[in-house]
Structures are given as structure tokens and as C-alpha cells.
Regions:
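Periplasmic alpha-helical coiled-coil/stalk elements that build and connect Gram-negative outer-membrane
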Residues: 86, 196-319, 433, 478-479, ...
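Small/polar, glycine/serine/threonine/aspartate-rich low-complexity segments that form flexible
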Residues: 46-50, 98-166, 301-313, 345, ...
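Amphipathic alpha-helical coiled-coil scaffold segments and their short linker/junction regions
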Residues: 62, 250, 254-255, 289-358, ...
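Bacterial N-terminal signal peptides that target proteins for export
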Residues: 1-9
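Amphipathic alpha-helical coiled-coil segments
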Residues: 71-86, 202-227, 236, 243, ...
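Acidic, low-complexity, intrinsically disordered peripheral segments
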Residues: 22-27, 33-43, 47, 104, ...
């Protein structure tokens, strides 16, 4: 075998083998990809990686990877397809058919035929039919025929016919009018708008939850830091008391009390560490960092040092106005009411009798050749008809459906009023919460400052022997609690603002988030 032939044969065999093993290779590639991802997860677990991250970064991660957002994002696209499906009712339909029919049989008459009657018929028809948004139905047909037989009495043999014809049916009562016939389109469009509001609500919930988890993590970082400082104060005090005990200034009871307090603070620090890790994991879950092979085990370092305090003057009436304008759940409910109005309209229309006016106009062309048939299809040979069709239902089922739709609307209106009451109460509650938390921050700031000043003074008194070990330990606890209360006040104030924005439907606007339509 020559070299070129061997090359061609080898390539052919390789091609066949590749085709047969394609499915197996694809499965193997998927398996390797899973193994690589598993390896990356395990490798990341062995690394001490630090991820510097801010609030804006967390929101960006959430918008990109949060599973609830990814699932809900598909809903408007599904509703867009429903709109196209509804509009398809008004798209024209082309139809065509071809029939060849041959018939040979014994003749029962001598008139025009011999002993055998033979016919051959070819039909070729085409047409366009459809419906306008007014309910008018149209049907435009082009009918052609070629007929040949062995009958001697047939004047044209073969003969061709060409018959253009248009038929129009116009409903007068039932199924008449633009509003009734486009009801499905309008409902589908409203359903899409409702799904967009639902998507907006999902994004708002995810963003608000992300911000809250971020502030919780910030709180537990500060909590861990405060507990660390508190433990250090106890250790420093223990060293001082050991030196004093050696000099006989304090008793063994003072040492025991200091050691007991230090043990309790070590326990509190461990608890703070556990809470910190849990808060870190919660933040990773909402941002979906937990599914990142490289970042799932990274230590999060916040670029924002401490929570901000920006005192805001909140206007209750303006907040309520915003809620009724921007809240997705309220807007979605109003869209649903519009759909119910449309369903009542269509149910009421179904009560009317069917009265359809029909009319058709056609031309008859006949000739020995097809061209002759085309030329003879003139107004001299017309085919027309007019008429009407009447159907009067007993009305039992249609009347029941109409009554049902009215009751559903009344029920929905009551539901809307209840929702409006809940919105008012919720917004008022959130406005109050912001005001209370703002005052809490002011009070806790003063308390922290006073406790810090008091502890500094008590330290001097303790150094002078005027304060007992028990008292100085108590002052340390009070200082740590005051510091923690202030941080908690800041966190709670920021969370109150987050909840207020969400209750007004302003979460996306306040965070400069614009959703794609």
C-alpha cells in the first residue's frame, strides 16, 4: 500500500473512532471537570487566603451569583414567550393542498362514454386565512383544477378552472371588538409586568439581606475585638495582682477572683469567635462565595472599618407616598386587578349571542388552458354570497363564570385594601424604628464615653488602693458592655434604614441598582 493511501486510511479509521468515542469522551471530560473542581475546593481549604471585601462588593457578588435571583430572572422571559403565543392568534396562516385523482370504471351509459369511463382530476389550491384584532376573520383562497375525461360530450377536454375567492366573517356581539379579542395579549403583557415586579422584589430581598448580613458580620468583628480587649484587661490586672500579692498588698481571694474573671472572659471570647465564624459563613452563603472553589474558605476582611452613622430626618408621609409608588408587591397586586377587570369584560361578552355576518366574493375562470382560465376570471363570472349565523346559548355556564369573575374581583379589591393597611402600618413601624435607633445611638455613645472616663478614673483609684479587685473587674465589664452597646446601636440603626428602604421599595434606587428589562 502506498504512503498516501495509508495516510488516508489512517485518517478514516481515526475519524470513525472519534465519532464512536465522542459520547464517552464528553462524559469523561465532565468527570474530569468535577474532579478538578473538587481538587480546587480542597486546595482552597488548605490555604490561609484573605479576601478584602466591602459592602458594594458583597452586593455585586449577590447580584451575580445568588441562586434565588438567577431562578427568578427567568420568569419575565417565560412571560415574554406567553405574549408571543397570544399574538400568534392574529398571525396569518398559509395553507396549500394538491390532489391527483384518477378514476377508471365500466360505463353504465352509452351517452358520451364508451364501455369504459375514465377521468383524471388535478386540484391545486392555496390560501391565506387569519383574524384581525377586531374579531374579523378572513379567508383568501385560490382554487385551480385540471379535469380530463374520455367523455365525448365534454366541450373542453381537458379544461382548467381558476377561482379566486375571499370570505369574511364579522362577529356583531359575541367575540366582537378590540378589547375582547386582544384580552389574552393584554393579560400576557400584564403577567410579564407582574413577573418583573416579582423579580424586583426578589432582588430587593437579596440586596437587603446581603447588607444586613454584612452589618452582622461587622458587629461580630467588633464583638470579638471588644472581648479580646476585655480579656487583655483581665490579664493585665492579674499580673498586677500577682505582683501585689507577692508584696502582701492583696489577698489570695483577689487573685482567685481575677483568675475566675479571666476564665469567664476567655469563654466569652471563644463564644464571640464562634459567632464571628457563623456570621462570616452567612455572608458567604448570601453572596454565593461558598460555591467559589477558590474563595469558599477565604477569611473575609472588611474594607469598611466601622459602621457609619448618618443621621437622617425621615418624613412619614413622604415614606408612605414612596411605598405606594415603588413597592413591587403593591404594584404587582394592582396589575393583577387589571387582569381581573379584563376577565370580567371577556366573561360578560360571552353572555351575548353569537351573531356573525358572513360574505364572500369570488370569480370563476374557465379555459382549455390554464392561461385561458386566468384571463376569463373576470367580473362577468362572479360567485358571491351573503348571510348570517346566529347562536343563542342557554347562558347557565357563561352566567356562572361571569358571576365568579365578579366575586373574584370583589375579593381582590378587599385584599388590596388590606395590603394598603399593612403597607401603612409597616412603613410607620420602620420610620419609628429609625427614629428610636437614632436616639439609641446617641444615648449609647454618651454611655460609652462616660464609662471610659469612669474606668480611667477608677484605674487611678485602684492604683492608689481605694478600689477593690471586685469593683475594678465590674468597671471593666461595664466598659466592655458600653462599647458593645454602642456598636450594636450603630448596627441596629443601619439595619433600621435598610428595612425602611425595603418597606418603601427604594432598596434598588438607594444602592444605584438598575435592572435590565
Amino acid at each position: 500500500m502506498k504512503a498516501p493511501q495509508r495516510i488516508i486510511l489512517g485518517a478514516f479509521i481515526l475519524l470513525i473512532y472519534s465519532g464512536l468515542s465522542f459520547a464517552a469522551d464528553k462524559k469523561a471530560d465532565e468527570e474530569r471537570a468535577r474532579e478538578i473542581e473538587k481538587y480546587l475546593f480542597m486546595a482552597a481549604g488548605a490555604q490561609d487566603r484573605v479576601l478584602e471585601i466591602g459592602l458594594a462588593d458583597c452586593i455585586a457578588y449577590t447580584l451575580k451569583s445568588n441562586s434565588e435571583i438567577l431562578i427568578k430572572r427567568i420568569e419575565p422571559k417565560l412571560k415574554e414567550d406567553d405574549i408571543r403565543i397570544a399574538k400568534a392568534d392574529f398571525e396569518p396562516v398559509f395553507d396549500a393542498d394538491y390532489t391527483l385523482h384518477s378514476n377508471t370504471k365500466g360505463s353504465t351509459t352509452t351517452l358520451g362514454y364508451g364501455s369504459i369511463a375514465s377521468t383524471r382530476d388535478i386540484d391545486l389550491n392555496a390560501g391565506i386565512s387569519g383574524k384581525f384584532i377586531t374579531g374579523t376573520e378572513y379567508d383568501i383562497d385560490f382554487l385551480t383544477e385540471r379535469y380530463k375525461s374520455n367523455a365525448s360530450t365534454q366541450r373542453l377536454n381537458p379544461y382548467h378552472t381558476f377561482e379566486p375567492k375571499m370570505t369574511v366573517t364579522q362577529p356583531v356581539f359575541k367575540d366582537s371588538g378590540i378589547l375582547v379579542n386582544t384580552a389574552d395579549i393584554t393579560i400576557a403583557q400584564n403577567n410579564k409586568a407582574e413577573s418583573q415586579e416579582g423579580f424586583k422584589q426578589t432582588v430587593m430581598d437579596a440586596v437587603a439581606k446581603t447588607k444586613i448580613m454584612y452589618y452582622y458580620y461587622m458587629y461580630y468583628l467588633e464583638n470579638h475585638s471588644i472581648n479580646t480587649s476585655s480579656l487583655k484587661r483581665a490579664k493585665d490586672l492579674l499580673e498586677i495582682n500577682k505582683a501585689r500579692y507577692a508584696k502582701g498588698i492583696v489577698s489570695s481571694v483577689d487573685l482567685l477572683e481575677t483568675e475566675s474573671s479571666m476564665a469567664q472572659r476567655e469563654k466569652a471570647l471563644l463564644s464571640a469567635e464562634a459567632s464571628l465564624k457563623k456570621a462570616e459563613d452567612d455572608l458567604k452563603v448570601i453572596t454565593n462565595l461558598v460555591n467559589d472553589p477558590e474563595l469558599w474558605n477565604a477569611k473575609l476582611k472588611l474594607v469598611d472599618d466601622k459602621p457609619e452613622f448618618n443621621a437622617e430626618k425621615i418624613d412619614l408621609l413622604e415614606s408612605m407616598k414612596n411605598a405606594f409608588q415603588y413597592r413591587p408587591d403593591y404594584n404587582s397586586y394592582k396589575i393583577d386587578l387589571r387582569n381581573r377587570d379584563i376577565k370580567i369584560l371577556t366573561a360578560k361578552n360571552a353572555l351575548f349571542p353569537t351573531v356573525d355576518l358572513t360574505g364572500s366574493l369570488g370569480l370563476n375562470g374557465l379555459g382549455k388552458e390554464y392561461q385561458d382560465a386566468l384571463e376569463n376570471a373576470t367580473t362577468d363570472y362572479k360567485d358571491w354570497s351573503v348571510g348570517f349565523k346566529v347562536e343563542i346559548p342557554w347562558g347557565g355556564g357563561e352566567r356562572a363564570e361571569f358571576d365568579q369573575r365578579k366575586l373574584e374581583l370583589a375579593q381582590a379589591i378587599m385584599g388590596l385594601k388590606r395590603l394598603e393597611q399593612n403597607v401603612i402600618l409597616e412603613v410607620r413601624d420602620k420610620v419609628r424604628a429609625v427614629d428610636i435607633q437614632m436616639r439609641q445611638v446617641g444615648a449609647s455613645r454618651i454611655a460609652r464615653e462616660k464609662e471610659a472616663q469612669n474606668y480611667a478614673a477608677q484605674e487611678e483609684r485602684y492604683a492608689a488602693g481605694q478600689v477593690s479587685t471586685h469593683d475594678i473587674l465590674d468597671y471593666q465589664e461595664r466598659l466592655a458592655q458600653a462599647e458593645l452597646d454602642y456598636i450594636k446601636g450603630l448596627i441596629d440603626y443601619n439595619i433600621a434604614l435598610i428595612d425602611l428602604d425595603k418597606s418603601q421599595g427604594l432598596t434598588l434606587a438607594k444602592n444605584n441598582i438598575i435592572l435590565e428589562e
